[in-house]
Regions:
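Short histidine-centered beta-strand/loop micro-motifs
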Residues: 21-24, 43-48, 66, 91-92
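A short, N-terminal "cap"/entry segment at the start of jelly-roll beta-barrel domains
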Residues: 1-32, 43
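A cytosolic small-molecule/anion-sensing beta-strand core signal
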Residues: 58-59, 75-76, 94
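Histidine-centered metal-chelating micro-motifs
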Residues: 41-43, 80, 84-89
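Conserved short histidine dyad/triad with adjacent acidic residue
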Residues: 32-48
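Glycine- and acidic-residue-biased ligand/ion/polar-headgroup-sensing regions
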Residues: 50-63, 67
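Ligand-binding loop in jelly-roll beta-barrel domains
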Residues: 84-106
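Short acidic-glycine-tyrosine-enriched beta hairpin
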Residues: 68-85
Length: 106
């Protein structure tokens, strides 16, 4: 099976909160697209399960967020890879589009 998703057409921005699009969900992995307006964020959180995630910045500028107030600059092409049990989040400094992959899916 092959599937094409035009992320920029399927998921727009929302002035009130981040927007979320489930791109793909299977027994093997999940892909999500999050769009943030400047100043919006996905608060730091973690999942008490085994697995890994990646967050790829497609467009815009922001910060990857971690435990104890850690911040890592995030721009186009930057990728965060982490165990899913590690605290993680993201904050937008400009309009920001990210693609998140989770394996196995939660």
């Amino acid at each position: 099976m092959m599937k094409r998703v035009a992320l920029f057409k399927e998921n727009d921005f929302n002035d009130l909160h981040m927007s979320r699009l489930l791109v793909h969900d299977s027994p093997y992995f999940k892909i999500l697209n999050f769009n943030f307006r400047a100043g919006q964020e996905l608060p730091i959180h973690s999942h008490e399960i085994e697995g890994q995630l990646s967050i790829v910045v497609l467009e815009g500028e922001g910060e990857f967020l971690g435990k104890e107030g850690a911040t890592i600059p995030a721009g186009p092409g930057d990728t965060l890879i982490s165990d899913i049990s590690e605290p993680h989040g993201i904050r937008a400094r400009s309009d920001l589009r990210v693609l998140v992959t989770i394996a196995p899916p939660i």
